[in-house]
Design a protein with these regions (language model features):
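Histidine-rich, glycine-flanked metal-binding segment
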Residues: 1-54, 449
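Metal-associated gating/positioning segment near the N- to mid-region
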Residues: 38-42, 46-101
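Active-site neighborhoods of metal-dependent hydrolases
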Residues: 116-177, 221-225, 230, 234-403
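Divalent metal-coordination and catalytic microenvironments
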Residues: 9, 29, 49, 60, ...
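Acidic, glycine-enriched loop/beta-strand segments at the rims
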Residues: 11-23, 330-334, 397-408, 416-457
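Short, acidic/polar
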Residues: 64-70, 150-159, 216
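Divalent metal-dependent hydrolysis catalytic cores, especially in the metallo-beta-lactamase
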Residues: 70-91, 103-114, 162-176, 195-206, ...
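C-terminal cap of metal-dependent C-N hydrolases
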Residues: 341-349, 354-374, 439-485
């Protein structure tokens, strides 16, 4: 007898191409069979009229907490990974997650930025986007090239993180643009040596030279070619700014030449980061981004800056404060809409949210267990609705691709980006015998994102059931409050 059978749904598996009504049988957290009219089970889910698909894999999730997991569960996510910034020490982070309990599967890369902070400053900081922001009070790790001795120490710290199971190397290069190419090349060679990807926020975000986005993309592709490293580009849509078409051309050419370069994007024209990011302080920021300072909005206060002086004061006060950056007007500008389409629909590219932590009105990060989230909890709509927005808008409404191809960008493609280095991903992102029972069951016609920039903490609708390792996280559209089935995703480690 099976533990659970999901009966009579439209089962879609992007790997095999299966798209037909069938049952999915689960035993001990693993899919055992997919066929019509499978046998008896201890429990059943009636999926008639619903889509049954692999759970979504998010390569870029900064929340890494119970409230963040819960919001992403309603977005169809079953695996949420912190790969762009990463963590350090890696082993300690995984131990902390296991002790706290997680709703979704979790994992992280080895955090190069935290290796720089530990080596080049006297600061002790937590492995989080907020911790990185607080460390920006000491500009040395941000603005200066490491000495040869420091480079050796940074490389060694990262090597230890990889040995502890870090899923590659996180390179938020834009937050430490002073890092030298010698340092970066050594780390990329290390990644190639151990067969692990790198995940890069490119060094520069600018529509104009010098230090343009295209400059940074050219350097990234050069590192892929010269070191053999797999260079994964984080949030392709935002770092390219208005030059996404040229950036896409460069990436396609690199891929045709056999270089290991992959991309991800999220379906919004507004980004988010910490206010202390050095690119905001650049006197040429308006020219480089093509926006004014009023495009930068403090998340907690919902306040837009009026001048560079006001921005600099905020950076001095709390560099870790989260902000929104409104860089594309996709609602009113058809040219901007086309740019976003180029990145979101890039062939072979993954959908990834760049979900950020939930912040309360007093500026603190919310890590509690209240459900629904507190009324004053804010983040970015992408933290709630990235995958449902993509499937609703790009797939169902605009029909830019078929449903099975749209689902592949949320499931199989991110799994394949990771699986050469992380064998656990061979069992995720697909539905078939032997695969992990990470499954989303949704009403395709009702699937929709509800979060916007006026109400960011509204959960998406349309996910009727969500299973993580065969355990229910969402049941009949409601959250299972005590569910903590999340398991670590980790490279082999000592």
């Amino acid at each position: 007898m099976y533990d659970l059978v999901v009966r009579g749904g439209r089962v879609i598996d992007p790997e095999s191409g299966h798209d037909a009504v069938a049952d999915v049988a689960i035993r001990a957290g693993t899919i055992e069979a997919i066929d019509r009219q499978l046998g008896a089970a201890k429990e059943e889910i009636d999926a008639k009229g619903l889509v049954v698909a692999p759970g979504f894999i998010d390569l870029h999730a900064h929340g890494q907490s119970i409230p963040a997991d819960r919001m992403q569960a309603f977005d169809g996510v079953t695996t949420a990974l912190e790969l762009e910034i990463g963590v350090l020490p890696v082993a300690r982070w995984y131990d902390e997650q296991a002790e706290a309990g997680r709703v979704l599967n979790y994992g992280a890369s080895t955090g190069w930025a935290f290796a720089r902070i530990a080596t080049m400053t006297s600061q002790q900081t937590e492995s989080s986007v907020e911790g990185m922001g607080r460390a920006m009070r000491d500009k040395r790790w941000v603005e200066e090239a490491a000495t040869p001795a420091e480079t050796a120490e940074i490389v060694e710290r990262v090597r230890v993180g990889l040995e502890q199971g870090g899923i590659g190397i996180g390179f938020p290069n834009a937050y430490a643009p002073g890092a030298g190419v010698k340092e970066l090349s050594e780390l990329c060679s290390l990644a190639a040596e151990v067969g692990a990807p790198t995940y890069t926020h490119i060094a520069y975000m600018s529509n104009v030279d010098p230090k343009s986005s295209i400059d940074a993309y050219t350097r990234l592709i050069g590192l892929a070619g010269s070191t053999g490293a797999h260079m994964h580009i984080c949030h392709f849509n935002s770092t390219s700014l208005l030059d996404v078409d040229r950036a896409a051309e460069l990436v396609r050419t690199a891929q045709r030449q056999g270089l290991k370069v992959t991309v991800e994007a999220y379906p919004y024209g507004t980004g988010s980061t910490v206010v202390g990011a050095t690119f905001f302080a650049d006197p040429a920021f308006p020219e480089r981004f093509g926006t004014g300072y009023d495009a930068i909005e403090l998340v907690a206060e919902r306040h837009r800056f009026g001048s560079r002086d006001e921005l600099l004061a905020a950076q001095a006060d709390d560099p870790s404060a989260l902000v929104l950056i409104h860089f594309l007007d996709v609602a009113m500008n058809e040219g901007h809409r086309s740019l976003l389409d180029t990145s979101v629909m890039f062939p072979g590219g993954a959908i990834a949210s760049d979900a950020i932590p939930w912040t309360l009105a007093d500026g603190t990060t919310y890590r509690g267990t209240a459900w629904p989230l507190p009324d004053d909890a804010v983040s970015h709509p992408r933290s709630s609705g990235t995958f449902t927005k993509y499937l609703r808008e790009w797939v169902r409404e605009r029909q830019t691709c078929s449903l099975i191809d749209g689902l592949a960008k949320c499931t199989l493609i991110p799994a394949r980006i990771l699986e050469p280095s992380t064998p656990a991903m061979l069992k995720k992102g697909r539905l078939g015998p032997g695969a992990d029972a990470d499954i989303v069951v949704f009403d395709y016609e009702a699937l929709t994102d509800r979060a916007d920039f006026h109400a960011m903490n509204r959960a998406s609708e349309g996910v009727r059931h969500l299973l993580v390792g065969g355990e229910r996280v969402i049941e009949h559209g409601g959250l299972v409050l005590d569910a903590r089935p999340g398991r670590p995703v980790r490279r082999s480690y000592r």
